[in-house]
Amino acid sequence: MQLQLDLYNSTRHPGNDADTMQTIKMVTEQNDRLNKMVKTLLDMSELQTVGRDEVIAVDALVDEVLADLEPLAQEKNIKLIGKCKDITLRGSDILIYRMVYNLVENAIKYNHLDGQVTVTAYQEENQVHLSVEDTGSGIPEELKERVFEPFFRVDKSRSRELGGVGLGLALVREIVRVHDGSITVKSNPSGGTIFEVVL
């Protein structure tokens, strides 16, 4: 289907009016969203088969995530800050990367212009605490547990604008679960939301 859309788009027939091109754009967006959904569902179905015995340098992993998401943050002039201690974590490098990536990406998307996203990690006894804090509008108290439900969106009116398929946080929760950890969401006293993972 994507090949057909690309081919149709590339021809740019003179007869294509604005409405037609808008329809093509919408169909392309929906196709991209469907592809992302299928990939995420496949990722979720394979979580149990991924090895989780790698030694992960948390600070290096967080730095990599922030570097990868810097272009997205720049679109909204959002400052990304890493405050991670020199600690290690045993688990799946690829899954922990995806967990942090999804949390930071979500924090950027739902943040305000000129906002800030801070990733903090430290060790307490035998557990690693990792939090992602943003300066956005926050999440209503009654919806905080629902954000981990597949396809749930706090602000449905912005689903097209923000992209995605509503599976990012559901995948995060599953990654935390297979690592025998916990995840909580709470309000930031200075505004915004804090997701805290304990592994």
Where do the language-model regions lie?
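A conserved beta-strand-to-alpha-helix junction within the catalytic ATP-binding
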Residues: 54-70
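Short alpha-helical segment of the dimerization/phosphotransfer core of two-component systems
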Residues: 26-34
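Short conserved segments within the C-terminal catalytic ATPase subdomain
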Residues: 72-81, 87
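Conserved micro-motifs of the catalytic ATP-binding
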Residues: 47-54, 84, 88-94
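Short conserved segment of the HATPase_c
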Residues: 139-153
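Short beta-strand/loop element within the Bergerat-fold HATPase_c
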Residues: 114-126
